[in-house]
Amino acid sequence: MALAVLSQPRFRAGQLVMTAGVNDLVQRGALDPVPYLRRHLDGDWGNLDDCDRRSNDAALKSGDRLFSSYQVTPTLKLWIITEWDRSVTTLLLPSEY
């Protein structure tokens, strides 16, 4: 029997919010945001360059904003942003920024 190990998130998500574009994709079954949100909360920043990854790692300590980018499909990118005070995490499409 395999045991699933659930890790504690590296930071609080606060209130979870998704934009209209993300909500539409979720409602149509074109996007399951949960795996990407888990990755974000675990400190897996997705498709960022080294500089942005280091900025996020530093922001975990300093309390600055956290940003992740995930290439869901060749034509679909999902951004996740957690505010500096960890009060809100927003899931959005780049076109909605």
Name the predicted role of every residue range.
Residues 2-67:
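Compact soluble domain cores
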Residues 61-97:
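Short, compact, well-ordered microdomains
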